[in-house]
Amino acid sequence: MRKLVLASAMMCAAASQAVADIKVGVLHSLSGTMAISETTLKDTMLMLIEEQNAKGGLLGEKLVPVVVDPASDWPLFAEKARELLTVHDVDVMFGNWTSVSRKSVLPVVEELNGLLFYPVQYEGEESSKNVFYTGAAPNQQAIPATDYYLEELGVEKFALLGTDYVYPRTTNKILEQYLKDKGIAVSD
């Protein structure tokens, strides 16, 4: 009986010491055209994880980064997100810089019920229970700037410019309607 109690106590002690790690997926381009912007975000995540672990982790559990390189290739972002969630079994992902990379990852994150923190401004008009959009949307950035030009600077005419890309196209569509609602025509 004594051996049984001792063995049970040892098993309980071992189980209480076995703390599960929290795997943090880092989904930023380390190569290709976006590497110049996204490598810094990867480095920042690794620094923050190291600092948090030095303070005892999160709720007593160690944070373990799992870094992948989607290589500035939008379809590869989806594949790497799937890899992080299924092969590496991460608990959360931090990543993407561009709207198109986020939109590539979104169906995978929703299908596998993952969690993504998206770090930069975005065009709005998208909502998912699986994504924390941490950057400003047009109603938090572009609209207040437009109001400033209208109210403080007295600007009466606007020309909406941007590259042929998701963020500027969508933001300009929102701004065009906003200006139209205020009775201001947008130049062609």
Residue locations for each model-derived region?
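Short, polar/charged alpha-helical segment
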Residues: 37-59, 174-181
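Residue-level signal for short, function-critical loop segments
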Residues: 30, 71, 164
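Short beta-strand segments enriched in small/hydrophobic residues
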Residues: 21-40, 96-97, 157-161
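Immediate post-signal peptide segment of exported/extracytoplasmic ligand-binding proteins
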Residues: 18-26, 55-62, 150-156
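Gram-negative bacterial Sec-dependent N-terminal signal peptides
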Residues: 1-19
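Beta-alpha junction/loop-to-helix N-cap segments that form part of ligand/metal-binding clefts
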Residues: 36-43, 56-125
